[in-house]
């Protein structure tokens, strides 16, 4: 343990990650700043992950049934003794200085409670072009957000124990978007940071169908969560207008204008492409929206070309178009479903002033 830093407990939730679990744990023990404990929480794996963890120098917690990553993280946090909790997914191998760099950020920024890492540009195991695409995009997306952030992601993240306890842990009803939802309950006094110095190599999804299924599922969850965040923000405004004490949770995070623009361009391209069957010259409409899409994400595409060349860039652009299209579809479905649920649950707002005693 490096002197002057708080104690760290590493929490590794795992479910059917026999392929990468050992690499994940060994990477933790190669850290220049050693944690006081490493806790692996097995979420009722069926592929031998539990047996692998039992043979590693870590504390193993076994959940009796599969309960999701939220429950696994909460179980690990409940057993941890460190002043800082470092959550790392079991398909990530941390760089040797990852924990030390996260602690340095916490020390340099006393108001910061959450330090989120980024993915390395190279995957932990390159199993095909789908994985290379996703890894490159995730690396670029996170690296561009180095500094103060407004949302929480917990694939490789350090958080002060006090802040975690103030939030009350992860919502165990959620199996997707649980980390984003966690951040909506984080008191506004706590700063969130993304650090490009906290790096891990990620073994991501490597087949097209699972990639699309995962992306749609998460997009639906994000869309539904967005409704809840907007409703909560509206209630805070009502409280302030009524003279009530405002809630301490942070307000709704800012909109990623670039991502929204890219999604809309992709949707417009897909929806207007059939116009070419009416008249050939109408192909200019989807061509224009597709060109706009490439301009919106131009910096990303130039980054990919520098690393992988023009041939892979063509594949990357096609995958990115598909990703944005499915993401918008999923978020639309999730938002609509969340809006319906919110409308059903929301009580009618009284227009009559409450009586007051004399």
Regions found by a protein language model. Give the residues of each.
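A conserved acidic beta->alpha catalytic loop
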Residues: 27, 34, 42-50, 65, ...
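Conserved donor NDP-sugar-binding/catalytic core segment of glycosyltransferases
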Residues: 97-129, 203
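Short, flexible, basic/aromatic active-site loop/helix in glycosyltransferases
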Residues: 116-119, 131-150
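Glycine-rich, basic loop-to-helix element that forms the pyrophosphate-binding segment
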Residues: 63-80, 101, 154
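Short, well-formed alpha-helical segments that are part of the catalytic scaffolds
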Residues: 17-30
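Catalytic donor/gating beta->alpha subdomain of glycosyltransferases that bind UDP-sugars
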Residues: 173, 180-247
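Short aromatic/hydrophobic "clamp" motif used to bind/position activated sugar donors
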Residues: 85
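Acidic donor-binding/catalytic loop of UDP-sugar-dependent glycosyltransferases
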Residues: 48, 92-105, 184
């Amino acid at each position: 343990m490096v002197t002057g830093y708080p104690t760290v407990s590493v929490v590794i939730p795992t479910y059917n990650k026999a392929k990468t679990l050992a690499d994940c744990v060994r990477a933790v023990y190669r850290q220049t700043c050693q944690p006081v404990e490493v806790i692996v929480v097995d979420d009722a794996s069926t592929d031998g992950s539990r047996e692998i963890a039992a043979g590693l120098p870590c504390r193993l917690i076994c959940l009796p049934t599969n309960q999701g990553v939220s429950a696994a993280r909460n179980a690990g946090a409940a057993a941890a003794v460190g002043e800082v909790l470092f959550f790392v997914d079991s398909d990530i191998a941390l760089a040797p200085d990852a924990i030390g760099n996260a602690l340095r950020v916490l020390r340099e920024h006393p108001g910061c409670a959450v330090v989120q890492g980024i993915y390395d540009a190279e995957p932990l195991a390159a199993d095909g072009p789908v994985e290379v695409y996703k890894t490159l995009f995730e690396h670029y997306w996170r690296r561009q957000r180095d500094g103060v952030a407004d949302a929480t992601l917990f694939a490789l993240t350090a958080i002060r124990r006090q802040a975690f306890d103030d939030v009350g842990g992860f919502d165990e009803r959620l199996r997707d978007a649980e980390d984003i939802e966690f951040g909506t309950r984080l008191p506004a006094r706590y700063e969130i940071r993304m650090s490009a110095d906290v790096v891990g190599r990620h073994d991501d999804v490597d087949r097209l169908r699972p990639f699309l299924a995962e992306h749609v599922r998460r997009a639906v969850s994000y869309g539904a969560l967005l409704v809840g965040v907007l409703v909560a923000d509206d209630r805070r405004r009502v409280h302030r207008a009524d003279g009530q004490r405002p809630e301490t949770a942070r307000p709704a995070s800012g909109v990623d204008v670039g991502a929204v623009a890219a999604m809309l361009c992709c949707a417009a391209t897909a929806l207007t492409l059939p116009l070419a069957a009416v008249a050939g010259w109408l192909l200019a409409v989807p061509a224009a929206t597709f060109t706009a899409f490439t301009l919106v994400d131009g910096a990303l595409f130039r980054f990919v070309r520098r690393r992988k060349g023009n041939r892979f860039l063509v594949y990357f652009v096609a995958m990115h178009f598909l990703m944005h299209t499915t993401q918008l579809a999923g978020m639309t479905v999730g938002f609509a479903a969340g809006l319906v649920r919110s409308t059903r649950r929301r009580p009618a707002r009284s227009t009559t002033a409450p009586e007051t005693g004399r």
